[in-house]
Amino acid sequence: MAEPLNEYLTAWDRKPVLRTVYNDFYDRIISVCAPGLTVEIGGGIGNLKQRLPNVVATDIQFAPWLDCVADAQNLPLADGTVSNVVMVDVLHHIEFPAVFFRQVSRALRPGGRIIMIEPAITWGSTLFYRLIHHEPVRMSADPLVEGTPDPKRDPYDSNQAIPTLIATRERARFARMFPDLAIAQADWFSFLVYPLTGGFKPWSLISPGMAERVLRLERMLEPSLGRLAAFRVMLVVEKRA
């Protein structure tokens, strides 16, 4: 098992406030899942299985709790068999998202969904992601560029701007490239709690109890402030019937 996964697992076990935030993520994912087979890409430390025990968990790296080791750009899934593909913090690590979307479109049944929670680059979050978070933000990148995936590429290479670019600047182009897919939802959420937890770092500036209260307040603010200040976006992409 890769060393970063060990570090993430340790943080997950030691930080109840981290679990509070991710349970909010999982509540959002579960609320929009279609009935049927659900496949997780980027299963990582396996925490989604605690909420969705029947999910088929995959990752590009081996871990004993995973059901399958697979690259998101070359999925071993039969055509038209999957109801949901769910991912947390995965899209911005994929080398060629266009290849990924074609793979998932092939595997989804009509009405099936890709449900992704990702970093949101907004007026309120940009300084945090650019100056504090360790992963790059390249807004000038082409998130839908074509190419052949490199099997030797570091799976932790990333561009945190990719999900925001697909949801905004490249949305019309996405529709042209993938006429069988539609971006059905782009929910902009999460303001203070996520950065205050420190993520998978050993520190946190907020308690679990306070995090729960602030999360409730944040949900009330999402309709008015989400697009301006959110730190997260949930994209729901649906395969047309």
Spans of model-derived segments:
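C-terminal lobe and adjacent flexible extensions of AdoMet/dcAdoMet transferase-like proteins
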Residues: 196-205, 210-241
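A short glycine-rich, Lys/Arg-flanked "PGG" loop and its adjoining helix->strand segment in the class I
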Residues: 99-113
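Short conserved loop adjoining the S-adenosyl-L-methionine
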Residues: 74-79
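Conserved N-terminal segment of class I S-adenosyl-L-methionine
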Residues: 1-73
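Short alpha-helix
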Residues: 162-186
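Short catalytic micro-motifs in class I SAM-dependent methyltransferases
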Residues: 89-90
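A conserved beta-strand element that flanks and buttresses the S-adenosyl-L-methionine
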Residues: 86
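Conserved class I S-adenosyl-L-methionine
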Residues: 114-150
